[in-house]
Amino acid sequence: MATSAQTLRRKRRYTEEDLKRLPRDGYKYELVNGRIRQAPTDGRHGEIGAGLAARLWNQVRRWAKVYDSSTGFRMHSGNIRSPDVSVLCRERLEGGKSPEDFINGAPDLAVEIISPSERPAEIYAKLGEYFESGAQEVWLIFPERRQAHRYTPSLQVQVLGEGDVLRTPLLPDFELPLTELFEEIQY
């Protein structure tokens, strides 16, 4: 019998196994400090994530894997995080293949698309966990502001606006004008 999200809400402390038993129902789930968090996303969020994942995949598919928000990463803290888009170098995967289980550690690049309802404390807690677990870079995408914030492990941030081009030393050939990322999205 499948475990429902409703049933899990009644428990006090959840485990990785509880998270694995959740149905694939279109929601994004994370295990954070023993609690399961559900974060449904809207169409604009999904469109930006899919567009960014496609652009990244076209650039890195020969030497890295690109994942969507349904992929769980096991942080050093024990939390399971699911970035909206992530890139992981194949050399970090056994045989260069994705495991059937959650992936140990953070992706090399984690991308979070930020909704207006997300609290800054939650956003920066995630940011810290990604870097503590091995991320090389984190991008926070703010669709309503039409901005991207590119963070490095030293927590230096580069704030980019609609007229700017998103680039990273992690992906030397990757360039994404933010105008293209946001062009179809109406607010």
What do the PLM-derived regions correspond to, one by one?
Residues M1-Y187:
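Gly/Pro/Ser/Thr-rich low-complexity, intrinsically disordered segments predominantly at protein N-termini
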